[in-house]
């Protein structure tokens, strides 16, 4: 039997011979302390212990050890930076978003500087209207034209609480978000006479995480809850999100409402379209829609179509009382196909 032995080290130099042993850091992974400003280098030494003795084996022969190997060095740089919003990003004292300029500042931190704001809390303090030239939050790392399965994806990963305020998208404008990863958007009202895309998140795409490796785990995409599509709103594509992602990139949509008078698919030329989602993997629960949905193929009252075949696509305790019009084939009152 082979048993791995792990030991993590840290150093102020990029050198595996000058590190200091980290007491208790003996697992395959290690989460460093990021509360202090500065640059620290981390690496792990691994050695395998062989244990194949029985009760007749002499004590000194019961264990043998393989050669020690060392991991690559991981650089962790912690920078103390003040942000332009009131609050500190905690659940009890979230960053306060009062104006469109606050949203623009958030976008620049994500799209230009690569901040993800993992688990940081933001709260809208009033109604906000996006400008007609709004560029959504979330993009690709500088110098990269493709996400490479998430490796070069600069996505928002925080928690946005709309606090029951209304976000209005300009006529013909783009939605609030482009790319998100493990984000939460909640307690928000959405409006826009003609939103040129999806209503909330414009890019639902394959995301295997920051290393782009499926085998190390795939993040969920978003949890969307208590979001209301207000009467008079219309979208070119699905009302919240859609696209084609990995089956493991789950989206949870819960307690969401689309009022009567909402139009989904105002051109009538889109396929894979529904009130809340287009191509979709995840769960919709406790949602209701009275919207009018137009499309060509795979047009559904709540969901256009199941996305990746191996992923989930579940709708529970939800209803559709609106109208679905499909000029092609595959249409349904709940899911198109």
List the predicted regions and their residue ranges:
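Ser/Thr/Pro/Gly-rich low-complexity disordered regions
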Residues: 1-80
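Surface-exposed repetitive/solenoidal architectures
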Residues: 79-337
